[in-house]
């Protein structure tokens, strides 16, 4: 079996049928998600920081709070438009504030709490209470003041929270156990600096909150994507924002199961094709290349959202995807068993055959992969590339 040999159904015929439809499907009719105006960004940012700063017994709404920060950055009207464009007929409920009636802040003002639709007031109050209690204890224990970047009010606290969301973003396509395991393992590595600043952060529980949110409120995926793309299109940004964009683009694109190899795709077309490919199961073979070429990059995302395990891509007519195929081959076990999991033998053989054919036709561009020396050596050994012929592939 080879990738070239996979016979695919005639998608052009299917597209012709679909184009004849004069109707659209309304989803989430009557659903009422919370939308927070930009004027409350400071309050939402602080709540995000409080979630990170202290240990809490309940993190169920952590992801929702993170998405409300997204709402404040995009703006309430734009947020509602994004939700509408995603096909969701939802009725937004604006977030408000209310006076707690007890206790005052450092400026002597009455404490104002956020009233987020769908989030119990008691939950918000408990998070705030625990964070203030932890802050008071830390201030007492420290000889000097707590650095600003270690406080709940740190400006990049919401971005750190959303970084965990980006790490879990593609995981609803896998099992909860595997998805969380992968995301948490990677978070402990890439969020190392944040963990030093916020040592009480509970990454597994926050990741679980995002997993549940993206699974239950699918329309939030579109909002998260638009935020990531908007942030990534900006030429400036903090260190945390740059980290988020890096994580997001890999999550939006290659996903984590492709190892580092999947990150080589430079366009959203390539990236989405790569992700769908690595989620492949031969029982559900679907050709998406023509779909992407016809409908643009969003078709790849649509395909992933509607059928996460959509099937193995046939890339026989897509020579520009050589690097992506090699990345898939790597993630699926050709360069070694991935995390001890037995690969799909048919898929293994197909990807191996295609990778070898690319090597033989000098189409593998190692210089574009950004490999470590160890990865490059593994690839060269697998494909039997000798020193004399090495330059043919760079």
From Swiss-Prot:
This protein's UniProt keywords: Capsid protein, Helical capsid protein, Host cytoplasm, Ribonucleoprotein, RNA-binding, Viral nucleoprotein, Virion
One Pfam family it belongs to: Pneumo_ncap
One GO location term (cellular component): ribonucleoprotein complex
Intracellular or extracellular location(s): Virion; Host cytoplasm
One GO MF term: RNA binding
Xref: InterPro entries: Pneumo_ncap
Stretches the record annotates as Disordered: 131-153
Bias-annotated ranges (Polar residues): 136-153
Subunit: Homomultimerizes to form the nucleocapsid. Binds to viral genomic RNA. Interacts with the phosphoprotein P. When in a monomeric RNA-free form, interacts with the phosphoprotein (via N-terminus). Interacts with protein M2-1; this interaction allows the association of nucleocapsid with the matrix protein.
Function: Encapsidates the viral RNA genome by forming a left-handed helical nucleocapsid that protects the RNA from nucleases. RNA replication depends on the availability of soluble nucleoprotein. The encapsidated genomic RNA is termed the NC and serves as template for transcription and replication.
Family to which the UniProt record says this protein belongs: Belongs to the paramyxoviruses nucleocapsid family.
Name recorded for this polypeptide: Nucleoprotein
Organism expressing this protein natively: Avian metapneumovirus (isolate Canada goose/Minnesota/15a/2001) (AMPV)
């Amino acid at each position: 079996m080879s990738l070239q040999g996979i016979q695919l159904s005639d998608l052009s015929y299917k597209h012709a049928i679909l184009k004849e439809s004069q109707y659209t499907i309304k989803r989430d009719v009557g659903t009422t998600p919370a939308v927070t105006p930009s004027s409350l960004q400071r309050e939402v940012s602080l709540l995000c920081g409080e979630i990170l700063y202290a240990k809490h017994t309940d993190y169920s709404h952590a992801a929702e709070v993170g998405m409300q920060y997204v709402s404040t950055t995009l703006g309430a009207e734009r947020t509602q438009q994004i939700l509408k464009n995603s096909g969701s007929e939802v009725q937004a409920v604006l977030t408000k504030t209310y006076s707690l009636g007890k206790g005052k802040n450092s400026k002597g003002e009455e404490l104002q709490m956020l009233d987020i639709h769908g989030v119990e007031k008691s939950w918000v109050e408990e998070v705030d209470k625990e964070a203030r209690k932890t802050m008071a204890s830390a201030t007492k224990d420290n000889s000097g003041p707590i650095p600003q970047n270690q406080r709940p009010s740190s400006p990049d606290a919401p971005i750190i929270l959303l970084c965990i969301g980006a790490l879990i973003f593609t995981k609803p396509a896998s099992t909860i156990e595997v998805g969380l395991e992968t995301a948490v393992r990677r978070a402990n590595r890439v969020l190392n600096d944040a963990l030093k600043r916020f040592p009480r952060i509970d990454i597994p529980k926050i990741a679980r909150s995002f997993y549940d949110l993206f699974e239950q409120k699918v329309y939030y995926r579109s909002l998260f994507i638009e935020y990531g793309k908007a942030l990534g299109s900006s030429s400036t940004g903090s260190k945390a924002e740059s980290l988020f964009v890096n994580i997001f683009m890999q999550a939006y694109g290659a996903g984590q199961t492709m190892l580092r190899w999947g990150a080589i795709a430079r366009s959203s077309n390539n990236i989405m094709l790569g992700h769908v490919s690595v989620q492949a199961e031969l029982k559900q073979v679907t050709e998406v290349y023509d779909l992407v070429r016809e409908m643009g990059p969003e078709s790849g995302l649509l395909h992933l959202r509607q059928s996460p395990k959509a099937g193995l891509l046939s890339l026989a007519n897509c020579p520009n995807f050589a690097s992506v195929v090699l990345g898939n081959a790597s993630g699926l076990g050709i360069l070694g068993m991935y995390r001890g999991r037995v690969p799909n033998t048919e898929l293994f053989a197909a990807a191996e055959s295609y990778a070898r054919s690319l090597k033989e036709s000098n189409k593998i561009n190692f210089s574009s992969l950004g490999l470590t020396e160890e990865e490059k050596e593994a690839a060269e050994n697998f494909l039997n590339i000798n020193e004399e012929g090495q330059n043919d592939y760079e």
